[in-house]
UniProtKB/Swiss-Prot annotation:
Extent of the signal sequence: 1-17
PANTHER family attached to this UniProt entry: INTERSTITIAL COLLAGENASE, MATRIX METALLOPROTEINASE
Protein name: Interstitial collagenase A
EC number, UniProt record: 3.4.24.7
Catalytic site: E216
Function summary: Cleaves collagens of types I, II, and III at one site in the helical domain. Also cleaves collagens of types VII and X. Able to degrade synthetic peptides and type I and II fibrillar collagen.
Glycosylation sites recorded in the entry for this protein: N202, N371
Region (Metalloprotease): 95-274
Residues annotated for Ca(2+) 2 binding in this entry: D155, G187, G189, D191
Amino acid sequence: MPSLPLLLLLWAASSYSFPVFHNGDRQNVETVWKYLENYYNLGKNMQAKNVNGKEMMAEKLRQMQQLFGLKVTGNSDPETLRAMKKPRCGVPDVAPYAITHNNPRWTKTHLTYSILNYTPYLPKAVVEDAIARAFRVWSDVTPLTFQRVFEEEGDIVLSFHRGDHGDNNPFDGPNYKLAHTFQPGPGLGGDVHYDLDETWTNSSENFNLFYVTAHELGHSLGLTHSSDIGALMFPSYTWYTEDFVLNQDDINRIQDLYGPSPNPIQPTGATTPHPCNGDLTFDAITTFRGEVFFFKGRFYIRVNRFMPEPELNLIGILWPNLPVKLDAAYEASMIDQVRYFKGSKVWAVQEQSVLRGFPRDIHSFFGFPSNVTHIDAAVCEEETGKTYFFVDHMYWRYDENTQSMDPGYPRLTAEDFPGIDDKVDDVFQKGENFYFFHQSVQHRFNLQIRRVDDSRDSSTWFNC
């Protein structure tokens, strides 16, 4: 009979190998199995109830969790299931698009393309412009050039299809598998197929045709999916923003295949923030129902006491109608709102919805003078309902109860907040303290004794 330590070891190994389905929802088995079949090359002839099938499923789950930046457990936990249900590209995350050093590529640098048909949701001219801009995303950072042809079939053919369309990769109707592409080569090689049933747009609503096309063209040129959540080539659809900039991860990978742009000034891309980067600064910080949200570019970093690690995600995932590169934010907990600032505009948000009538102008909404063009930082003191707006080295105070500015402001920040001598970049309240941020340093200002009692690196919020 095996010893107790051996039995425990066997139990641990089996619990690690076999996926667990939470809440007794056996429907999840089919969801996970089908997802791993489609995107992770899980054998179609395997059965989930078979021991080998369970082991293989757990291994494929770990691959998926690794790529998506999830906790790697081999189990179908709720976070993994949520990721699986998001709209995404139909190209597999593994073979034939395996991440290897032998990715297929075009052997020529001048490629042609043709548009076979159109979506009914957009005018033809808008479709053509979106596709042309998507090609420019890649020609701007490589030696590649692209030309549309009309009388012949291009190297890359773009077309819209519904359901089973004869390429062994059927579409599934609205809101899930958006498009798929074939790797470089003759025939279907490089071709882009869109799901005709999707609502294609040229805005942040539904699915942006330019953004999806730019992603699919990455595959047309030989790129695989990226594990960088900020990359264009991340597998799931990430909401489009008007100031789109190609991520540096995408630039590095496409230049590995085709070389750099011939332009004398090499383009640089956006980068995804890493919470434990000691030099990391933030655009805005706010609390919300006990959590803290740190905003940077298109991203937020979310911290609460129930999460062992900070959550990095895209602003558009939670708030698709908010701008990116915010200036400031604060929570008005007495009315269950968070207010976000960019330039001279303010957005009032409850839950995930921007309230009707917003954005509003800060001059008419709060009463700022016309020479205030933006807000650097803001915080609402919980006990008093007074909101402090910091601009350069001055601050204004606003009464949330009377909805008016207090008289006698602006005042110098350093006079009323001793120790806060630099411009305030961000601020929020936690307990009896205001946390002031300047560049990558935070100062804890004790509201009871009215002075700074601690200063440290900003990344300490992320358990670094």
